[in-house]
Amino acid sequence: MTAAGDRPVLTDGRLRIRPGQPGDAARLRAILAEPSVSRWWAEPDPVEVIEEELRGDDSAVLLVVEIDGQVAGGIQYNEENDPMYRHAGIDIYLGGRFQGRGAGTEAVRLLARFLFEQRGHHRITIDPAAANEPAIRCYTKVGFRPVGVMRQYERGPDGTFHDGLLMDLLRDELPPSPRKRRRG
């Protein structure tokens, strides 16, 4: 587990990933309740639970995604720190008005770069619902590859089990940020 003091602040242009602040939990819960998000996530946790996650009282590190200074969603990671494995997992959600504009792709890319370069991981996994095509496109743009379908992986909001798609990205597969590429 990463201590709350170790939580990064990552920025790239208009996008910022930062530790949570008082008041963020209510906004994140509202985003999780939006139809475009709740379709893929379980019932939102109470504000108190989200506050605990933002403080670091959980095994996952939950961070806030801001776009142009507005809370757009959450991104979290968990780490396997055993040197024999040294990998991390990521999850992300963005409010409906921030979806489909490249923000998710950039947030995942930014966090992946941090996990590889600053935390020393060699592999990152992400596990969207197999039917969540927009998320899969987003992760593919970052460089993630499908490695298998996990049948009846998680219970959806409708109460039935749904397949998950396991995707991973190795350290040397992360392409440079589009802003950093040289023309020529």
Show the residue positions of the predicted features:
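A short, well-structured alpha-helix characteristic of acyl/acetyltransferase catalytic modules
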Residues: 1-51, 172-184
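Glycine-rich phosphate/pyrophosphate-binding loop shared by adenosine-nucleotide-utilizing enzymes
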Residues: 15, 70-74, 162
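Acetyl-CoA-dependent GNAT
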Residues: 39-99, 114, 170-174, 178-184
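Conserved acetyl-CoA-binding loop-helix of GNAT-fold acetyltransferases
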Residues: 100-114, 136-141
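Short glycine/proline-centered loop/turn elements that form peptide/ligand docking sites
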Residues: 104, 108, 132-135, 152-157
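Conserved GNAT acetyl-CoA-binding A-motif
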Residues: 117-127
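Conserved catalytic-core motifs of GNAT/GCN5-like acyltransferases
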Residues: 125-128, 145-162
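Conserved active-site tyrosine of GNAT-family acetyltransferases
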Residues: 139, 144, 167
